[in-house]
Each structure stands twice: as C-alpha cells, then as structure tokens.
UniProtKB/Swiss-Prot annotation:
Protein name: ATP synthase subunit delta
Domain of life, per lineage: Bacteria
Disulfide topology: none
InterPro entries, sorted: ATPase_OSCP/d_CS, ATPase_OSCP/dsu
Locations listed in the record: Cell membrane
Function per UniProt: F(1)F(0) ATP synthase produces ATP from ADP in the presence of a proton or sodium gradient. F-type ATPases consist of two structural domains, F(1) containing the extramembraneous catalytic core and F(0) containing the membrane proton channel, linked together by a central stalk and a peripheral stalk. During catalysis, ATP synthesis in the catalytic domain of F(1) is coupled via a rotary mechanism of the central stalk subunits to proton translocation. This protein is part of the stalk that links CF(0) to CF(1). It either transmits conformational changes from CF(0) to CF(1) or is implicated in proton conduction.
Family annotation (PANTHER family): ATP SYNTHASE DELTA CHAIN
Gene this protein is translated from: atpH
Quaternary structure, from the entry: F-type ATPases have 2 components, F(1) - the catalytic core - and F(0) - the membrane proton channel. F(1) has five subunits: alpha(3), beta(3), gamma(1), delta(1), epsilon(1). F(0) has three main subunits: a(1), b(2) and c(10-14). The alpha and beta chains form an alternating ring which encloses part of the gamma chain. F(1) is attached to F(0) by a central stalk formed by the gamma and epsilon chains, while a peripheral stalk is formed by the delta and b chains.
Alphabetized GO MF terms: proton-transporting ATP synthase activity, rotational mechanism
Main location: membrane
Membrane topology: Peripheral membrane protein
C-alpha cells in the first residue's frame, strides 16, 4: 500500500479505536457488506478514489448507496474512509476490509478477560488453515467459482466445530469474498491482525538487572494502571542497559535505560 494510502488507513484506524470497546459483530457484518458494494463497481471505486473530488463529495456518494441499509455508526465509519485520499481503488477496498476485520477482532477481545478472546480467535483461524492445507479436496471446493458463497461458508463452518462467533464471521468472509486471494491467505491476514491486537495486552520489559518479586509486582501494577488494562508482563535482563528499564506494549516503546539516556546526551553534544 502506497504512502498516501498507508497514512489514510492509519488515520482511520486511529479514529476507530474509540468505537472498538463497544464493537459488535453486527457492525463488522455491515462494514463487510459495504465492502461488497464497493467491490461490485469499478466505476464507484474510481469515483471514491478520484483525487480531484472533494472528500465530502466522495463521502456523500458512498452514503447515498448505503444509507438505510447499515447503521448510522457504520455509515459514519465508511464516510471517514471515503473522505481520505487513496493511491489506488484497490487500496480503499483493502482499508475497508481491514477496518471491518478490526471491528470483528475487537468483539473477540471484549468477550473475554485479558487476551483470552484473542487467543481463542487466533487458534480457531489457525485450525481452519491447517485443516484446509491438509485437504486438497477442501481447497478445490473453497476455490470453486461455480459454488455459492453460502455453500462455501457452510463447508468452512464444518471444518472448525466449536469456533467462536467472530472466527466464523471472519472465515465466512474469507471464503465468500476472498477478493482475488486464496481464502486461507485472507484468513492468515486476519490472524495477523488479531496477533497485532493481542500485543496490546503484552508488556515486554527489559531491565539492566534482575528484579525481586516485590519490584516485579510494583512494575506490573504500575503498567496496568498506566495502560488501563491487566497486562501480561514478560521481563528479561540485559546488562548492557546498565540501569533503568525499556518497555514495549504493542507498537509503543518507552526507553528509560541509562544507555539510551547516554545516547541521547551524545547526540545532543554532537549537535
């Protein structure tokens, strides 16, 4: 995805965070249904990614096609997507697919404490892909162009008995509308999104010397308070840090190590 599209997707995903704590599977389904509308018309995709059109005009166009068919919340999300700039028509669809999948993944995240819901989701997606990989007949059935989406979804559901609601939703989307990819490849992409989401629940802490139990407990409590959720804290020792601590939670890194502060000082002196 080109730089301008990547920036637009990042902006929309950042705005989406406020919705995710109360996300529903129905919202994800609605967003996937809008994706089907966008994918159904090359002319619509060109209009929505035309750099000469105002963002509000593009949003109005898409809204006119989905209003009354999806919730106001879904319409607001796709409006935000349509207003952004996209390097290609494909990029808009890919971003909408990512947004819909992220909403679904958030449902799994909200259903169980900590990262349990995400772990269950990842496992269900993994089991599906392993089952498909081991059976060429299933692979052919899922890629058969004459088979209906409903038939493919029914087969996919039978491959992972006991799968979560969200896993069934994402797997069903992958087999019904793979958008030019192999269904298993799209499921793998969804699993990667879930894994990235799960990293928000893991704090990787590096310290210069080993901590005692009391220090570990205080560190965990402080991180949980800082991030507002119960994190799984993994602590490792790296003597080269000399002192201080380095913390990674998801994409965020806080480096308060002595070696980092010395490096900053050297850069300031060199400047």
């Amino acid at each position: 995805m080109a730089g301008i599209s990547s920036d637009s997707r990042a902006k929309v995903l950042a705005e989406l965070e406020s919705v995710l704590p109360t996300a529903t599977a129905q919202l994800a389904r609605e967003l996937f249904s809008v994706l089907a509308v966008v994918d159904s018309s090359a002319g619509l995709r060109r209009a929505l990614t035309d750099p000469s059109r105002e963002g509000k005009d593009k949003a109005a166009l898409l809204s006119s096609l989905v209003r009354g068919k999806v919730s106001a919340q879904a319409e607001q999300i796709v409006d935000s997507l349509a207003k952004e700039r996209w390097a290609s028509a494909r990029d808009l669809g890919d971003a909408l697919e990512t947004v819909a999948a992220t909403v679904a993944i958030a449902v799994a995240e909200n259903e169980a404490p900590g990262a349990e819901g995400l772990e269950k989701l990842e496992n269900d997606l993994f089991v599906f892909n392993q089952t498909v990989a081991a059976n060429h007949q299933v692979q052919r059935a899922l890629s058969e162009p004459q088979a209906s989406a409903e038939a493919k979804q029914k087969l996919a559901s039978a491959l992972v008995p006991g799968a979560s609601q969200v896993a069934e939703l994402l797997i069903g989307q992958a087999v019904a509308a793979p958008r030019g990819a192999r269904p298993a490849k799209l499921v793998e992409q969804f699993a990667t999104l879930a894994a990235a989401r799960q990293q928000r629940w893991i704090a990787t802490v590096t310290v210069g010397q080993a901590l005692n139990k009391n220090q570990e407990a205080r560190l965990s409590a402080g991180l949980n308070n800082l991030y507002g959720r119960d994190l799984k804290v993994n602590i490792s020792v790296d003597p080269t840090l000399i002192g201080g601590v380095r913390v990674r939670v998801g994409d965020e890194v806080v480096d308060a190590s002595v070696v980092n502060r010395l490096g900053e000082l050297r850069r300031q002196l060199a400047g």
